[in-house]
Amino acid sequence: MNAAELRKLSAEQLKDKLAESRKELFDMRFRHATAQLEKTSNLPATKRDIARILTILKEKG
């Protein structure tokens, strides 16, 4: 999801999306540690998504 799409969401929706992304990152890290993660490039992408969401939440105040 890009920044323009995220900016259209409300603060509550962003918080839900943030929780979902953090859970996804946790699961990916676990699968990576047990050598079950196929696309390791998704790890940094998810981190960037979390950073984007946090930035937009700060902008909204």
UniProtKB/Swiss-Prot annotation:
Keywords for this protein: Ribonucleoprotein, Ribosomal protein
GO terms assigned for molecular function: structural constituent of ribosome
InterPro entries: Ribosomal_protein_uL29, Ribosomal_uL29, Ribosomal_uL29_sf
Signal peptide: none
GO cellular-component term (any): cytosolic large ribosomal subunit
Superkingdom per UniProt: Bacteria
Gene Ontology process terms (BP): translation
Family classification: Belongs to the universal ribosomal protein uL29 family.
HAMAP family named among the record's database cross-references: Ribosomal_uL29
Protein name: Large ribosomal subunit protein uL29
The organism of origin for this protein: Nitratidesulfovibrio vulgaris (strain DSM 19637 / Miyazaki F)
